[in-house]
């Protein structure tokens, strides 16, 4: 299956992606590579794999909550480069 520009535009609109005109060709190429890979995976013969082989056997590895010693707010403030009103002050990383 190959996507065309119209399909890409519809997908971008539905997923609220803003694809710039100069990125359109590369994005379309990337989507088509992904779809080619999906087609390859769909074509694999998995009839010899038992259903119980698919699931991972994994035990719950969450540690129990234990109340213990902890640092006071004053001790934590000593380690922080910037601390204000009970919170760590960090550089802004997401612009709105």
Swiss-Prot record:
The keyword Nucleotide-binding applies. It catalyses: L-glutamyl-tRNA(Gln) + L-glutamine + ATP + H2O = L-glutaminyl-tRNA(Gln) + L-glutamate + ADP + phosphate + H(+); L-aspartyl-tRNA(Asn) + L-glutamine + ATP + H2O = L-asparaginyl-tRNA(Asn) + L-glutamate + ADP + phosphate + 2 H(+). Its EC number is 6.3.5.-. GO terms for biological process: glutaminyl-tRNAGln biosynthesis via transamidation; regulation of translational fidelity; translation. GO terms for molecular function: asparaginyl-tRNA synthase (glutamine-hydrolyzing) activity; ATP binding; glutaminyl-tRNA synthase (glutamine-hydrolyzing) activity. Keywords: ATP-binding, Ligase, Nucleotide-binding, Protein biosynthesis. The keyword Ligase applies. It is an enzyme of class 6 (ligase). It comes from the Bacteria. Heterotrimer of A, B and C subunits. Allows the formation of correctly charged Asn-tRNA(Asn) or Gln-tRNA(Gln) through the transamidation of misacylated Asp-tRNA(Asn) or Glu-tRNA(Gln) in organisms which lack either or both of asparaginyl-tRNA or glutaminyl-tRNA synthetases. The reaction takes place in the presence of glutamine and ATP through an activated phospho-Asp-tRNA(Asn) or phospho-Glu-tRNA(Gln). Belongs to the GatC family. This is Aspartyl/glutamyl-tRNA(Asn/Gln) amidotransferase subunit C. It comes from Leptospira borgpetersenii serovar Hardjo-bovis (strain JB197). The gene is gatC.
């Amino acid at each position: 299956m190959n996507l065309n520009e119209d399909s890409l535009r519809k997908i971008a609109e539905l997923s609220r992606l803003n694809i710039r005109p100069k990125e359109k060709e590369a994005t379309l190429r990337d989507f088509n590579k992904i779809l080619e890979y999906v087609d390859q995976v769909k074509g694999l013969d998995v009839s010899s794999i038992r259903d119980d082989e698919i699931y991972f056997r994994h035990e719950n590895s969450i540690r129990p909550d234990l109340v213990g010693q902890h640092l006071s707010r004053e001790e934590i403030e000593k380690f922080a480069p910037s601390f204000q009103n009970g919170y760590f002050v960090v550089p802004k990383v997401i612009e709105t």
